[in-house]
Each structure stands twice: as structure tokens, then as C-alpha cells.
Amino acid sequence: MSSHPYVTQQNTPLADDTTLMSTTDLQSYITHANDTFVQVSGYTLQELQGQPHNMVRHPDMPKAAFADMWFTLKKGEPWSGIVKNRRKNGDHYWVRANAVPMVREGKISGYMSIRTRATDEEIAAVEPLYKALNAGRTSKRIHKGLVVRKGWLGKLPSLPLRWRARGVMTLMFILLAAMLWFVAAPVVTYILCALVVLLASACFEWQIVRPIENVAHQALKVATGERNSVEHLNRSDELGLTLRAVGQLGLMCRWLINDVSSQVSSVRNGSETLAKGTDELNEHTQQTVDNVQQTVATMNQMAASVKQNSATASAADKLSITASNAAVQGGEAMTTVIKTMDDIADSTQRIGTITSLINDIAFQTNILALNAAVEAARAGEQGKGFAVVAGEVRHLASRSANAANDIRKLIDASADKVQSGSQQVHAAGRTMEDIVAQVKNVTQLIAQISHSTLEQADGLSSLTRAVDELNLITQKNAELVEESAQVSAMVKHRASRLEDAVTVLH
């Protein structure tokens, strides 16, 4: 600690119920500090533990006060006084320090200090005294925390009760002897008076002083935390009851400390188990969160794919409807073609009939021409001109017959082709009808697929929303588990701190 620490002379007032507690080892290094002391001092627990306790000492405190405190504590006695401590930021606070040695197995193992708020009157009383002590301009000193005068008068407050009683008895004997001398009493009277005073003094010490010393000794054992048995007086008056009460208080404190220590150990074990379980739950919950988030991502991808498939199916449905309409129109066109081919076949048949008629006419004309030639030959010279005409007519009839035969052949060939074409057109018509029917079936299937895809999209959307809600719930659970882990860690820390505090008194 610096010989001139930074100070601001700014007072930090404490609440009435403020209690600061700390313990040190035999070399005055801090071994434990309660949360209130940590908060008021401005340091962290890690900064305080293992450090000398004078790190909170204010430079305005006189060295004589701490010298008196250590002198008293090392004698195994408690010390109480007003102390000005320094905070980490340089501010200060006033407390009434109650220090006591911690005795274990008859030996001092450390020191404990419990500090409460000092009143304004106490501060006003000691502040000028501390300044005077630092300046060396005072006739007073500090003895076991009390402000006393220097010299033999200052020793009177520290006299043991036994010597106080003896002093009073001696003073009474002197006064009595003076009275006897004044009345000129014989020497025997002096001796008798001396014996009476001695007997009274011995009786007073035996009946009053010694029991009070026992009470003080018992109370000191309770205050220092020393394990002890209850001392008893074979009397039931106020002193006997007081000693019993002090002893009972020590037993109750010991029972309370042992019970709390046992409970704290159970709480610590439970908090460790809870912390371990919470950590495992936190890990599992985090894995669940990751899995749910991965599921959400997969569901979103599936939803996008289903939406895309739904759009594709809808487009395919529209295309299938268009194709179905086109197929229907093609079927109607094919029906028209079939009808046209049937009409062509009928026309071809009629042409064949007409050709046959022309052929018959040519045949008849040829016969008539032959008959005319015969008649022209019979007529001689007069029938030559008619014979020439008859020859031409026969020639034309022959050509007509030949042409009719050629037309007949063409018509027969065309009729065969028309018949074949008609059969093919009818077959194509039937195929077109099948295509139209299949296209209608495909259209219906695509419509069903589109409807099913829409239903799947709706169902998947609902499932995605449910998974999203599950994700939110899982995340909230993860947050709750994290809060539980923090609370568990806090409980574990508090249990550890409480165990440390109980260990101080155990």
C-alpha cells in the first residue's frame, strides 16, 4: 500500500442496516469478505482476497488506534472503535469496527471484523481526536478502543473488576480506620474491622466478581467462536441465569452454524447437480434449436419448391387446357376432312357413273356410225358425203370411247386412292378422337395435380408456420434454459460464498 494513497475527503454515507464483515489470517491478509464490504470498498472480491487489510486504511487514521487494536486482539480480547476507511476511488466511510480473534483449539487462527455504520455523534467525537493524535497534541490515548486520559487516571477504566472491588474495600477500610482513630478505638477494634473488610472483600469476589469473570470468559468464548462446553454456576440468581443464557447462546450459535453448514453443503451439492443438469439441458436445447432451425430452412426450401411446382403445375394446367382445346379443334378439323373425303369419294363415284354413261354413248354412237356407213355404201355416190361424216363420227366415237376408258382408268385409280385416303382419314379421325380423349384425361390429371399441389402448398405453409412457432418456442426455451443456467450459476456462487462465510465461524 502506498504511504500516501489518493483521497478525496468525500464521505460516503452508509445505511443504518449496513454490515461489513471480513476475516484475515494471522498476518492480516484478507481471507474472506462479504458482498456488502466488497460493494462499499469499491474493490472486487478478487482484488481484496489475499491482500493486506490495510489497503482500505485511510491515512487520516492514527497509527496508535491500529496499534491498540492489534495489541488487544493478540491478547485474545475483542476490540471496538470508530474507524475511517478509504474506498478505492479515494472517498471514505465511517464505521464502528468490532474486531475479535478467532480461536480454534485454544489458539488464535485469524481475526474477524464486523463493521456497522458510525453515528454522526460518534464521528464528531473522534474526528478531532484523531487529528490531535496524528499531530501529537493531545493528553488522551486509545486503550482497547476506548478514549482515555494519559497517566494513572487513564488506567482506571482498564482496571479489572477484581481490583476495582479491592480498591473500594480498601477505601472503605481507610475511612473506617479514620473514624475509629477519631473516636480513639482500641487496636483490637482495628483488627476486627480489618478482618471484617477482608471477609467482605473475599465474599464479594467469591459471590460477585468471580461469577462475572466466568460470564465474561464464557461470553468471550462465544464471541471468538471457540468450541466450548457450557459453564454452570450452582446458583439460580441473575448471575447464574446470565451465565446459562450466555452458554446457551453459544450452543445455539454452534448448532446454527453446524446446521447451516450442513444445509449449505447440501445446497452446494444440489446447485452443482442443478448446474450440471442445466448445462446438459442447455446443450440439448441448443442442439434442438439448431435442428429446428435446420428443419425450418429445409421446410422453407420445400415450401419454395412446392410453390414453384404449384406455379409450374398451374402453367401446365393452362397449357394442357390449351392443348385440349387445340386437340378438340383438330378433331373437329379432322371430322371436316373426313366428311370432305367422303364427299370426294361420292363425287368420284358419280364421275365414274358419268364416264360409264359417256362410254355407253360412244359405243352407241359408233354403232350408229357403222349403220350410217352401211347405209351410205348402199346409196352409192349420193351417200359418199354421208359416209365421210359417218366415218368422222365413228372416229370421234372411238376417241370418246378411248378418252372415256382413260378417264375410267384415272377415276378407278383415283377411286382407289380416294378409298385408301378415306380409310386413312377415318383411321386418323379415330386416332385424333383417341388423342382428344387422352388429352382430356391428361388435362384432368394435370388439373388434379395442380389442385393437389395447391393443397400441398397450403398444408406445407401451415406446417412451416407450425415449425416457425416451434422454432420460436424452442428459442424461448433456450433463453429460459440460459436464464436457468445463469440462476444456477448464481445459486452455486451464493452457496459457495455462504459456505465460505459459515466456514469462518465453523
UniProtKB/Swiss-Prot annotation:
It is found in: Cell inner membrane. It holds the Pfam family HAMP. GO terms for molecular function: identical protein binding; transmembrane signaling receptor activity. The chain crosses the membrane at residues 167-186, 191-209. GO terms for cellular component: plasma membrane. Belongs to the methyl-accepting chemotaxis (MCP) protein family. This is Aerotaxis receptor.
